[in-house]
């Protein structure tokens, strides 16, 4: 995986701004430009830690695929970084990456009636030609 959200790594470990992505051999190049922070804020990490119970990262390829799927099913075009939140509910299902975590960290049935909110930003700010390239890339990746 080329990219990790250093904010999540810093908050999860309590290291906050004392670590950066380069410490882990990661180049900090990602389609998720809104999340491409190479060093997390210690101030924000300290404030958010009590409210955070888990985190995940996605590869750029997944975000592009989700971009194309959302455009095809909902006619909604978002920038790649906005799609990162879309995959969370999938990962919390039994047998998925965070499935075991949610089964132990949350009370039984806590997700049964959960509402998952995604901060869907930026699509209208992306030039049409660039969005078409994102979409085409997502469609091509989905065919693989």
What are these regions (language model features)?
Residues 1-3, 7-50, 107-144:
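Glycine-rich phosphate/pyrophosphate-binding loop at beta-loop-alpha junctions
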Residues 39-111:
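Active-site-adjacent helical/loop segments in soluble small-molecule enzymes
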